[in-house]
A protein has these predicted regions:
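Contiguous, non-catalytic segments that form substrate-binding/exosite surfaces or channel walls
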Residues: 1-97
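Long, amphipathic alpha-helical stalk/connector segments used for oligomerization, subunit docking
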Residues: 145-189
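An active-site-proximal "capping" alpha-helix that borders the catalytic cofactor pocket
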Residues: 131-146
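Secondary-structure transition/capping motifs at alpha-helix termini
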Residues: 51-58, 96, 110, 114-122, ...
Length: 189
C-alpha cells in the first residue's frame, strides 16, 4: 500500500487500507471486472446460467425481490419460506461484478434449498445439512462471475479479452477466497 499511495510504510494510515477488517480482498490486480457487467441484465444472466446446467430458477426469480428501492435492506440473502419449495432471494442488484457474483451466490443457496425441499421428506430434513454445505454450493457458483471462461460462455466477453484478463482474474479470485477463509475462521471459532 505504501508503494501504491507513494508514502513511506511508517506513514500508512487506516484510510490507506481498502478494508481494515479484512473481509474483502483489496484491489491489487489490474482488472476492472465491473466494466464487463455495466450494460448486462444480471437477472437474465443468472437465469440463463442456471438453465444451462439444468436448473430452472424462473419461479424463484419471479418471487424474489431483486432491485433496490428506498429504505430497503441493503444486504442480500436467500430464504426458504415454507420448506415446500417457496424459495426467494432478496438482493439490490445494479449491473456490476459484485452483484453478478451475489446473484450467482444467492441463487446457489436457492437451488440447494430447492434440492432439499422434497415433498416426501419430513420437515426436519428440509434444511441445509450444515451452513458449510449451503455456503460451499453458493461459493462455487459465485466464483463464475470472476472466471473469464464463464464470461465467454455467457457472451459477456470474447476469447481475446478472456486471455488478456485471465491471470488478473485468477489472482483476484484467489485473494478473495483466501481472505474469505480467514474471515470464516474468525466467525466460526
Amino acid at each position: 500500500f505504501a508503494k501504491r499511495y507513494g508514502v513511506a510504510e511508517s506513514d500508512l494510515m487506516p484510510w490507506h487500507f481498502q478494508d481494515r477488517f479484512l473481509q474483502e480482498a483489496p484491489n491489487l490486480y489490474p482488472v476492472d471486472l465491473g466494466k464487463y457487467y455495466r450494460d448486462k441484465n444480471l437477472e437474465q444472466l443468472t437465469t440463463d446460467f442456471y438453465a444451462s446446467i439444468g436448473l430452472d430458477i424462473t419461479k424463484m426469480m419471479a418471487a424474489s425481490d431483486l432491485y433496490p428501492r428506498d429504505k430497503k435492506n441493503q444486504h442480500a440473502f436467500c430464504t426458504d419460506i415454507d420448506g415446500e419449495g417457496d424459495v426467494r432471494v432478496m438482493c439490490n442488484i445494479t449491473p456490476s461484478d459484485y452483484w453478478m457474483s451475489t446473484m450467482l451466490h444467492e441463487f446457489g443457496h436457492a437451488v440447494y434449498a430447492m434440492g432439499h425441499d422434497a415433498s416426501g421428506l419430513p420437515h426436519s430434513l428440509r434444511g441445509a445439512a450444515h451452513t458449510f454445505t449451503t455456503e460451499a454450493v453458493a461459493m462455487i457458483y459465485e466464483r463464475n462471475a470472476y472466471k473469464p471462461a464463464w464470461m465467454v460462455k455467457m457472451g459477456i466477453i470474447d476469447e481475446k479479452e478472456a486471455a488478456a484478463i485471465s491471470d488478473a482474474c485468477f489472482n483476484t479470485l484467489r485473494l478473495k477466497q483466501l481472505l474469505c477463509a480467514r474471515c470464516v475462521q474468525v466467525v466460526y471459532r
